[in-house]
Amino acid sequence: LPPVVLGVALLLLASCNSNQTTSSSKGQLWERELGAVQNTPLNPGDAQKELNLKVDLIPEGKYGRRLFREMTPQYITIHSTQNPTGDAYAHAKALNRGALRGGVCGYLCWHFTVQQDTVIQHLPTSERGEHADFDGPGNRYSIGIEMCEHQGNNQLATMERTAKLAASLMYYHKIPIENVRAHYHWPREGYNPPNKDCPHFLLENGQPGTTWRWFVGRIQRHYDRLVAFDEATREQRMKEEEAKRRKQMVQRFWNVVTEFVGLG
């Protein structure tokens, strides 16, 4: 190859390797900072308490809930607010007074907003939101979660709380991990580009890559703890039932022996 062409090729290769290393190391760095997810069973009820969930629903019949649209959730959609000034409480206030316009019903709305220390719920998970793709499946069948990005908010703690929330929603709604999607996944008709760079800090070049896979893997590990608790509880219940059955058998045996000796 001519020296100029070879030089350009090497630069492109170095750029690709640099992007891969950066995206891969971002998840690895966050994993080190957060620490590994424990592999011990966790009571789903205790997991719910850890979320520090506050319910502040949009008024029924108003704004994002002015039309009752029932939903059986099949997906979970992860967003980031891209709002440097609004915390979870500010977003709740905006939704509750219909300040965010758009979508099919005329008002934007989603189910949960997460910041470093709390989760606020805006919609029941049995109702459709307006957060992804107008009248597409992202709105019709998915629970929308927004991660805050305001100044002073700990991004890593927010992501971890979001991962725990997603795991809990997977558990209670029987949603498989492959149905946890980035907002990017749902194309928006009429937009260019149709796929939004969201949640932008979990994507590479505007698309899901190694960092997104790291995040989804962390959700899966939190979910596995909840399932493990069910399995451990089921095993313990089976052991207790077996012990009870054996005790009853022994008691019946001694009743027979006692009756026989008494007759003798």
Placement of each model-derived feature along the sequence:
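Bacterial N-terminal signal peptides
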Residues: 4-14
